[in-house]
Structures are given as C-alpha cells and as structure tokens.
Amino acid sequence: MRLQFLAPLALVFLSVRAAEPAADLEHGRVLFLQSCALCHAAGPGTTAGQGPTLIGVVGRTAATSPNFSYTKALQDSRLVWDAATLDRYIANPTIAVPGTTMVIAVPVEKDRQDIIAYLSTMKSQPGGDPAPAPTISPEAANDPRDWRHASPGTMHRVVVDQLPAPFATVSTRNNSAVVPRPADARLAVPAGFSVQLFAEGLTGPRLLRIAPNGDLFIAETRSNRIRVLRPAVDGASASANELFADGLDRPFGITFYPAGNNPQWVYVANNNSIVRFPYQAGDLKARAAAEVVVPKLSETTNGHSTRDIAFSLDGRRMFIAVGSGSNFAEGLPKKSADEVARWDAEHGLGAAWDFEFHRANILTTDPEGRQPLKVFATGIRNPVGLAVNPITGDLWTSTNERDGLGDDLVPDYVTRVKERAFYGWPWYYMGKFEEPRHAGFRPDLAGKATVPDVPLQAHSAALGIVFYPASSGAGVFPAEFHGDLFVALHGSWNRASRTGYKVVRARLKNGIPTGEYQDFVTGFVVDARNVWGRPVGVAVARDGSLLVSEDGNGTIWRVTPAAKR
C-alpha cells in the first residue's frame, strides 16, 4: 500500500552512474530490493510499484516515464540522468531538486555506486512501460468500492471470510495525478454538517495535532519542518501562521507531554529518531534546540518513513510506530527452526529479521528514552497513525497492508493494538491467510496472527486517525459521534478501480469497534485519473470541529454541524 508517503516515494528516481570496476552488482541488487523495490520496478523479481519504473533509467530525461504523475519541480528540472547528475540526486534528492517528493537519500557513496551499477544493467524492453489501467470501465462503474460510489453516510464492512483468493485480479499500477483544485470542487459531508476551507498555501501538510491551548501543529514532512496555526476566535480560519521548527528529518508524528493543559515538551517523530522541544502553552516558535530522546529506531531507514508517537494515559510509556522497509519482506534470508524460535523469543512472535529488524511493529520505551526500545506488537506492515482511546486507554493504529495480490487484497485496517500480539506481516494476513509469496516459510505461525478490529477496503491507504472526544464548543458534533474514530484515507494506486481519497468514521460502541465504517468526507477525486486532494491528517479542534489536511494542494478543511459555522 502506500509507502511511507509514499506519498514521498521511496527512491523514486534513482540516479544512475556508469558502472565502475569496483561496483558490486549483487550488492546493488540486494540494496535495490531493500531500499527501492517497494515503489520501483527494475528487472526480474521486482514488480511495478507506485513510483515510475527504473528500467532504462540510465540516460533517460527526468520526468518522462509514462503513466506516472511527476512533481512540477522534476518536470521543470530538465535533467538528464547521466552518471554525475543521478549520483548527485540520489545522494540528496531535496537539495538536488527542491520540491521533489522523493525524500529518501542514499548517503553512502559505495552504496550509490553499487545500486547505479545494478540499474545500468536494466534495459527497456520493446513495448516500454505497461499501459495504465483504463480510465472508465464497466467493472469500475459497478464496483461498490470505486470512488464514484463514495458518499457521506454510506456504510462499509469488510468480511474477512469473504476475501478473494490471492491474484484473483491482476495487480495494477493505477497512480492518480494530482491536479490543482478545480474552481467548482466541493467536498461532501453528511446531512446536518458543513465543510469550509480553513487554511491553504501549505507545503504538503501531513499529520495534525492540537495543542492543549488550541494551536494546530502541522508536520510539513517533505520540507523537514513543523508549522503552527492559531485558530481565529471564531475557529473558521487561522489568525497566526508560524514556523515552529525546521531542519528535522522527515517529521511526521507530533505529541505533547505530559498530558493536561500545561505540557512541558513537544515530541516529534523523525524518520529514525525521536526528539523533543521544550514548550510552554502558546509557543509559536521552538524556544530551544531539539533534544534527542531516542537516537535510533532501527538499523535501516528505507521504505516506509512515517513514524508516529503516542503516550499511554498514565504517561509512563511512549509508543512509536515504525513501518516496514519493503512490501512483503522480499529477499529475506531463511532461518532454521531453532534460529526462528530464538529470534521470536527475543524480538516477539513473527517479527521479521535482517533488513526488517525493528521494522513493521510498534516499539515502546519511557518518555525520557532511558529504557531500551522494546517491541510492543509485531507483524504490522506500516502502522502510520497512532491514537490512544481517551476513555479505555487502548492503543490504536492505522495500517497500510501489502500490495501486489490483487484489487481487494490485502485489506488495510484500523485496530486496537494488543501487547505482544502478532498481526501477520509478512507471513500471514487477516489472521489465517498465508502470504503466498512466503508459502511454507513459517508454518509454525499458522493460526497465531491476530485479526484486526476494522478491516478497510484494500489499497485505501489509511493514515491519520483521531478519536472524537465528548467535548463542548461551538463546533461540537452530536453525541452519537462521541467516542468514534475518524480515519483519513490517502487513496489507492494498486487497484484498477480507484478507491480511498476520503475521510471515514469507524463506529465504536462502549469503546468496542463494531467492524463497520462510514464515509464522512468525500469529493477529493476529479475523475478516474485525476485527484485534487489526498487526505492525511485528522484532528479535533478545541471548539469540537474536525480538521482535515490533504497534501495534494496543501489545504486544511474544517467540518462543523451546519448551524455552527
């Protein structure tokens, strides 16, 4: 599913340098599988991901591979991927081409040399890239999960026992093209609600968090910074817009500590570390440099790069979500039964190893980071968003599941996360179903994977989540919404019929999920090929209104009961 952004595409346009005598092709192939194959095809054993193919990239003009929506920055760069240019790009993409959505770098020169040498052996075949999925088809028109059928109030339930077999449909690369928001674009919300533009002109706003005083903290991940907006008195717009901190490393998760009206710290989850800034209520700019709390989360930083953080209700534990480096741990070396048993005993049931060590799981430590990182739960491919239920104390996550098995596999999900539970990845999915690409690899895990609470339509790309509290205020929702969970769906790329691109409401009853979810905000899709918005963050403002960020055109939207604008 969605790679770390991916949105930010992991190694989207790998540079290529002429192979040198010292280059190690096999090492380059392994590095490619570990770092790039999640998004890019480049030869045998790799399939098309959400990024452009890298077959034939050597000598290619930037932003010319068909069937992919490139950033304007890369289109305007007019670069040709010769050895020197491409090596410079992969070393630091955002410096080489400011505005590119590729943020993952390969800092080690020898690694770049080996990857480039491997890529230089990959030549385009007659026929070029595969054609994109058809823009209109009878199948799409009749598919109840297609974007055309999204409508506020529509209920959904994914029944695990009715899932199709793997490869029942062909795995399709069907990227959306992000276009400027049309003048007549209108978001749709349920009857009795209203939605208005809250802020615009932001740079790829991702996760949202509300400070106790009501300020809105925004992760502008691609720009490596945190921004703060202060809502106006009526809550309908921002009266202040300030840069809180920059110079970060792909910041995503934000939270405040300790709980209450006067937190002392703002915690930020970087790609591979946790830092915090001293904070007093009302600060619009960081009052001091960041303090490192956890210096390293994992040994690898490729693949999914979003990291979220949350604290337990008692404030004693800090939870950290770390996504996988790959789609399904392709290329993972095998271990003997004894080696597997020892590994599981030390790192948790079903935990992957090698380049996936400390990946695809939720880690925990104390708020000061003094205790060694421990695995809280395993087998969660890309746990993007975290939230603690303010009533029950349960930890929840949103998860992007694996790609390549067909239009309706594997369901994404939101779920309560149980300590020491195993959620399947990479060996199984949705409890009992074995991953066919690892058939026979871990028979000992049969029947041991936990089934998630709320499966979502496959390839929806669930990102930010927030519980709706029983609050008061000018924008407060009706009581029936209190305790439910809102989920931002960034939208599909690996499905013939487009799905996601909306905000949904997961229903809970007395803190227990019903398994159903409901369309709540729709209207981000223009047509079968184009979208203007991709929802990422959701947050409940101090006045009770719901705020939604989208990183396609850099806007934030505000949902209120219709009579409470």
Predicted regions and their residues:
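Sequence/structural segment immediately N-terminal to covalent heme-attachment motifs in c-type
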Residues: 22-44, 54-55, 199
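Surface loop/turn motifs at the tips and blade-to-blade linkers of beta-strand repeat domains
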Residues: 197-202, 243-249, 293-301, 375-379, ...
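C-terminal capping alpha-helices of c-type cytochrome domains
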Residues: 80-129, 546, 551-552, 561
